[in-house]
Amino acid sequence: MGSTLENQVALVTGGRRGIGQEVARVLGNEGALVIATATTSKGAEAISANFQASGIQGHGVVLDVTDDAAMDACLKKIQSEHAAPSILINNAGITRDQLLLRMKDEDWDAVMATNLRAVYRLSKICLRDMLKARFGRIINITSVVGSMGNAGQSNYAAAKAGVAGFTRALAREVAGRQVTVNCVAPGFISTDMTEGLSESHKEALLQQIPAGRLGSVADVAGAVAYLASPQAGYITGQILHVNGGMWMG
């Protein structure tokens, strides 16, 4: 276990599986006390059990990132039981894919609420303590789709592009207090979802990726861990693409 994040408290949303789970594990292995969120009690309990088995400080909590009162209560509990988060990883996200002419208003609104508004709200309530401490790391998980678009994902692309703009604006506001704000933008990452794709679909994806392979959750978590580290204190307002060369803009 490393110690580059010793004495730091990290809040990771969407920490039950996939990228969020690996980010929480890596930050914990670097010495941070990690609070990772899930949408159900069962999910939060699984996070806590995984942490205990791995020797990671921290635990899982239930959080609906679209519920302002729940976010406020979650932060107050973390502050009272541990300390204010000095690292915030806004990872929770959903998709509601559909061609625009078939997309329902509620599908647009749901994606915006979870993928964009929650980033604004959690960043806002965590920021005050970071500014007082004159240290903080806010890392938002976006997507290559926010840069290049993808048919059937106008809601998701708009939300992720919005997070990128939010990140750059906030970075300018808080840089003088030693708080950095950055994005990590994954490309196509190997997950349970991609494992279920047909071989022809996988091949079509790989043809778009110069590296010739799908990314791993470890690829993404490594980028997040670097941006959270003391060594990244002079990096802010950046979008770090982790996509095997699929997007180079």
Predicted ranges, named:
Residues 175, 180, 235-237, 243:
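Short, small/polar-rich loop/turn modules that mediate ligand/substrate recognition or access, typified
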Residues 30-46:
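Conserved glycine-rich Rossmann-like NAD(P)H-binding loop of the short-chain dehydrogenase/reductase
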Residues 16-17:
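Conserved glycine-rich cofactor-binding loop
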Residues 99-100, 104-112, 194, 205:
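Substrate-binding pocket helix/loop in short-chain dehydrogenase/reductase
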Residues 128, 172-176, 233:
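Alpha-helical segment proximal to the catalytic Tyr-Lys
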Residues 123, 159, 167:
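Active-site helix of classical SDR
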Residues 143:
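Residue(s) in the substrate-gating loop at a strand-loop-helix junction
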